[in-house]
Amino acid sequence: MARRYGRAPRGERCQAPVPYGHGKTTTFVGALRLEGMTAPMVLDGAMHGAAFLAYVEQVLVPTLSPGDIVIMDNLSAHKSPAVRHAIEAAGAEPRFLPPYSPDFNPIEMAFSKLKAFLKKTAARTVDDLWDAIANGINTFTPTECQNYFTAAEYNRE
């Protein structure tokens, strides 16, 4: 990822190396709690049903507690009966956002911050990208995460 805009002194051109061509897709998936980002996973390639189910069973479910609520958007990979069953077996409740409502998804705000961080670090190799993602996840404070939920109009009641 690279920044699309930059600054330079008046009269000088802003120059920075930017990769060209279409690179590989890297997908990040994670969960957001009031305390911070949790259950992160990076996947080479696009998200699909089998990959999301593996994420839920192997990464997300071990972090869930009875009574937790798992909010997901309407990606087809999220709607698998096996995903629902795995979440419910952990004592958590799966819920889906209304269609076309990213403003009600607090993790979208966190993803925006993470993407800005990744553009700033300008990682050019897969290993550097994975390291940058790990460093970016650690920048989320509990107060900031609580504010994401407040901005998405969630409350603790």
Language-model features, listed with the residues they occupy:
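Short functional hotspots at interaction and active-site rims
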Residues: M1-E157
